[in-house]
Swiss-Prot record:
Organism: Arabidopsis thaliana (Mouse-ear cress)
UniProt keyword list: Acetylation, Coiled coil, Endoplasmic reticulum, Membrane, Phosphoprotein, Transmembrane, Transmembrane helix
Cytoplasmic side: 1-215
Family: Belongs to the VAMP-associated protein (VAP) (TC 9.B.17) family.
Chain segments annotated as transmembrane: 216-236
GO CC entries: cytosol; endoplasmic reticulum; endoplasmic reticulum membrane; plasma membrane
Protein name per the record: Vesicle-associated protein 1-2
Entry function: Vesicle-associated protein that binds the oxysterol-binding protein ORP3A and allows its targeting to the ER.
Coiled coil, from the record: 169-215
Signal peptide start-end: none
Compartments where found: Endoplasmic reticulum membrane
Matching Pfam families: Motile_Sperm (PF00635)
Residue ranges annotated for the MSP domain, each copy included: 5-125
Topological relation to the membrane, as annotated: Single-pass type IV membrane protein
Amino acid sequence: MSNELLTIDPVDLQFPFELKKQISCSLYLGNKTDNYVAFKVKTTNPKKYCVRPNTGVVHPRSSSEVLVTMQAQKEAPADLQCKDKFLLQCVVASPGATPKDVTHEMFSKEAGHRVEETKLRVVYVAPPRPPSPVREGSEEGSSPRASVSDNGNASDFTAAPRFSADRVDAQDNSSEARALVTKLTEEKNSAVQLNNRLQQELDQLRRESKRSKSGGIPFMYVLLVGLIGLILGYIMKRT
């Protein structure tokens, strides 16, 4: 939308409405004249919106941005309908004017000033939806009938293959665990039997050493003691 002094973009202030969240919308004002143009922004609901700046000056052949912020709302209007409106007033200012020079009297028609006014609507739009996740069973090669069932419960067809696969994996893991336990048990039993046999031989050597007249310890006795210690350490480490 445009008037004789300024171009206004956009013509409607659109806010992607979300509860409990501040939302901003930019309004661009373009001066298409060789004059300094003062502007003022009003709203029908000043407690709901914050406008920065709400007054200002647009230099000749240049543009300015106005940021309109809607305060966080606790409730959503029915069907996202909004009746709020904004009014943009603009008037030719003196050369070299600054925002500090803008006064309320400049926009008074009673004082004989030529004031241009443009009404802007507020439009609420739904926020963009997140992308939908890819449904299971939609890969190439799957049967078209798998997506629709007679009673409308399409999820029944996609959940069954996943459950079966998980159950097979669990069974495989359980079989491997049982096999490992069996193997370790057999190794432990073999080690225990070997330990018992060595213990018997050690007892026999002890009896023979007692009958020996010499007080020295036979070399075989020392060797067996060391071997038993190694075997016991191996068993304790494996179990």
